[in-house]
Design a protein with these regions (language model features):
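Amphipathic, interaction-prone secondary-structure segments
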Residues: 1-27
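Acidic, low-complexity intrinsically disordered segments
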Residues: 31-77
C-alpha cells in the first residue's frame, strides 16, 4: 500500500487499482488524524463499488503496520 497526503487529505492506494481518499488534519510532531467517517467510497474508476466496514478496517490495520519512527503517525478517529 502507498500512502500519500496533503495537509487535509490522505490517500490509501492499495496498488491494485483501488484508492481511498479520506479527510483529516496534519498535526505537529509528524502526526496525521484521519477521520474514519470520511472513508466512504473508492476513488474513480471504482466509485460505484461499495466499501465495507471490513475493507476499511483492513486499510487501517495495514496502514498501522507500516508505521515506523521515520514515518508520519496516523490516528484514526
Amino acid at each position: 500500500m502507498k500512502i500519500t497526503g496533503t495537509r487535509s487529505t490522505i490517500t490509501f492506494d492499495l496498488e491494485n487499482g483501488f484508492r481511498l481518499k479520506a479527510q483529516g488534519e496534519l498535526l505537529i510532531n509528524k502526526k496525521f488524524v484521519v477521520y474514519k467517517d470520511s472513508m466512504t467510497q473508492w476513488e474513480p474508476p471504482h466509485e460505484n463499488l461499495p466499501i465495507t466496514q471490513r475493507g476499511i478496517e483492513n486499510i487501517i490495520n495495514t496502514a498501522k503496520k507500516m508505521e515506523s519512527n521515520q514515518t508520519i503517525q496516523l490516528a484514526f478517529v
